[in-house]
Every structure is written in structure tokens, then in C-alpha cells.
């Protein structure tokens, strides 16, 4: 089976929310009429003036709809978008399009699994057409310029998926890329995450290089301060989102090699040692945990966070049932992926 995805972005998501439709959604959701009335007039018919020294501008209308920095924005957009996704799922189900939908604020993703890229492209085209028209009816604008298609495959054969022609919808022809960037994550077609690890490791290495400038100050930095600076600033960047590639039976030779080079470079800088010093020795002197043990520690700590969630949280059903809270686990349980 081949997995394909199509990512699209909603332009000016917060300012485009329709107040009247939002009020109908709140009323349908069972909110108090006074609350519905409040949001019906929320940030509507507002005016402002600009003052600069002795200059004052004329009155300007600023109907902001829902402000992006408002504390209400996350809640309102979730209620607004939930209806859009609910209707979209119904349309796709009626057309027998086996598409999965993921959404994070204004970034959405359509995912399909099929036996050929041609079938995937056909389903993605139909699904995107439905999603685009549905968002337009809700007053939301989809950015065609940010729409991307990506195909996943671990086949060792020549990988040449066909392009997706969306020109009839006003979007350009989409050509699959070698990597896909989403929410600061970098995905490759085989999900090996080599480019992802390289990107953040190089970022951390650059930080270690720039840290040397701090050592040239009048007072400089002692080894203890250098070690603290590396652990609190450079290392968290290198290990950003490590849970996505660090799991049971995952190939770790490449990632441990790259991260090991990073830590060795930092350790040499901390004590000012020669490059010929052994890695284990320099890590012991600088009190740095070997990178593979540090990853194990962070992984176990992240797994413990699930116990701080409420018993009816959706993530509880994805993890191994130790407390017998759920009699039936999710069909694709993550218990086999969270042991290391």
C-alpha cells in the first residue's frame, strides 16, 4: 500500500470567521443565549485612531472579526472548524472516498492509502475540490500557492510518482517533492527522518560555534557555565521532536552518529581539549550523559506524561492498557512503539 497526502493552508483564518455563522454554531452547540449574543457583537463595528506626537489621524473602521491574539480565538476557531470538518467527512463518506483528515488550526492534511499513485491522485483531487468549495461557503479562503502533495513509499525501485493537476480548480500543477515540511517537522518518503535530524543537528552545531564567541569575553565562561549553556540551549534544539523518530525497532545508527558528533564537538569546547581525546573520556570529564542514554531518559519521561491526562482522554486509548481503564484498545495501539 502507498500513502499519499495533500496539505493546504487557510489564508487569514482568524479575520475571516463569519460572526453570524459563528453565532449559529454556538447556539447549535447549546451555549447560553447571552453568550451567543455577546459573540454576535464581538469585535464588530470597532473604530480606532492613531496618534503620533501632535498628529492624530481620522477615525478608521477595524472590523477584525476574531482577533488572532485574543484568548477566545483558539476556542472559537475549534468550534467553527469542527463543523467544517464534520460536513467534509460526511461528503467524503457519501462518495466512498477513504480519506483521513488532519487539521491543526489553519493547516489541514488529506491522507489516503491505495495501491497506485494514480488512484491516490484521483481521490486527492476530488477531496481537495470538495474541501475547497466547502471552505469557500464558510467564508474561508484556501491558499492554492501553499498546497503541496507528497507520496510515501519504502520501495527500493525507482520512485517517480506522477504530478497532481489542480489547474481546473485555480491551483497550479503540484509536483511531489523529496521532503515535506509541516509544523517544523521534515518528512522524507521512507520516513527515515535523516534530513530532519540533519537540520536540527546543524542548527545546534551552529549554536555551539557561536558559543565560542562568548568565551572570548573579558571574563569568559568557565567549563561549568559552558556545560550548562550546551545542555539548556543547544541540546534541546537538536532533540526537538525526537519522539517522531526515536521509537521501538527504529533504525538509530545514523541519528546517534550525527548527534554523537554534535555532543563531542560541544564537549571539546567545554574543556578546551584536543580533538584526539576519546569520546567517552571527554563526556565523563564534562559530566555529559552519552547521547543514547540521554535519549532513553527523555523517552521514558515523555511516556510518563500520559498518566497526567484525564482517564477519558483520547490518548489514553492509544497507549498500552496498564490501569485497565479501557476494556478495548484502539486497533492500532502505540504500545509496540513506546518501548525502548
Task: Please identify what each model-predicted range represents.
Residues 9, 26, 39, 50, ...:
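Mobile genetic element proteins and their domesticated derivatives, centered on retroelements
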Amino acid at each position: 500500500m502507498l500513502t499519499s497526502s495533500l496539505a493546504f493552508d487557510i489564508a487569514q483564518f482568524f479575520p475571516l470567521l463569519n460572526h453570524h455563522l459563528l453565532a449559529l454554531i454556538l447556539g447549535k452547540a447549546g451555549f447560553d443565549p447571552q453568550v451567543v449574543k455577546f459573540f454576535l457583537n464581538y469585535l464588530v463595528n470597532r473604530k480606532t485612531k492613531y496618534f503620533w506626537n501632535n498628529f492624530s489621524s481620522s477615525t478608521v473602521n477595524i472590523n477584525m472579526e476574531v482577533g488572532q491574539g485574543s484568548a477566545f480565538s483558539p476556542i472559537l476557531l475549534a468550534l467553527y472548524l469542527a463543523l467544517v470538518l464534520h460536513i467534509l467527512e460526511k461528503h467524503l463518506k457519501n462518495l466512498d472516498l477513504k480519506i483521513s483528515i488532519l487539521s491543526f488550526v489553519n493547516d489541514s492534511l488529506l491522507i489516503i492509502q491505495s495501491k497506485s499513485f494514480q488512484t491516490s491522485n484521483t481521490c486527492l483531487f476530488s477531496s481537495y475540490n470538495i474541501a475547497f468549495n466547502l471552505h469557500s461557503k464558510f467564508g474561508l479562503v484556501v491558499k492554492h500557492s501553499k498546497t503541496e502533495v507528497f507520496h510515501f513509499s519504502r520501495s527500493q525501485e525507482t520512485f517517480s510518482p506522477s504530478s497532481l493537476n489542480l489547474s481546473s480548480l485555480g491551483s497550479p500543477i503540484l509536483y511531489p517533492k523529496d521532503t515535506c515540511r509541516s509544523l517544523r517537522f521534515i518528512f522524507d518518503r521512507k520516513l527515515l527522518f535523516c534530513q530532519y535530524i540533519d537540520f536540527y543537528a546543524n542548527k545546534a552545531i551552529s549554536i555551539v560555534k557561536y558559543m565560542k564567541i562568548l568565551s572570548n569575553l573579558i571574563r569568559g565562561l568557565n567549563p561549568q557555565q559552558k556545560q550548562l549553556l550546551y545542555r539548556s540551549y543547544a541540546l534541546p534544539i537538536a532533540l526537538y521532536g525526537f519522539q517522531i523518530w526515536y521509537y521501538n525497532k527504529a533504525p538509530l545508527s545514523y541519528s546517534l552518529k550525527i548527534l554523537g558528533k554534535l555532543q563531542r564537538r560541544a564537549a571539546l569546547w567545554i574543556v578546551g581539549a584536543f580533538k584526539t581525546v576519546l569520546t567517552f573520556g571527554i563526556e565523563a570529564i564534562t559530566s555529559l550523559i552519552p547521547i543514547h542514554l540521554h535519549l532513553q531518559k527523555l523517552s521514558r519521561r515523555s511516556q510518563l506524561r500520559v498518566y497526567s491526562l484525564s482517564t477519558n482522554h483520547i490518548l489514553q486509548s492509544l497507549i498500552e492498557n496498564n490501569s485497565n481503564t479501557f476494556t478495548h484498545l484502539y486497533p492500532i495501539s502505540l504500545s509496540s512503539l513506546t518501548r525502548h
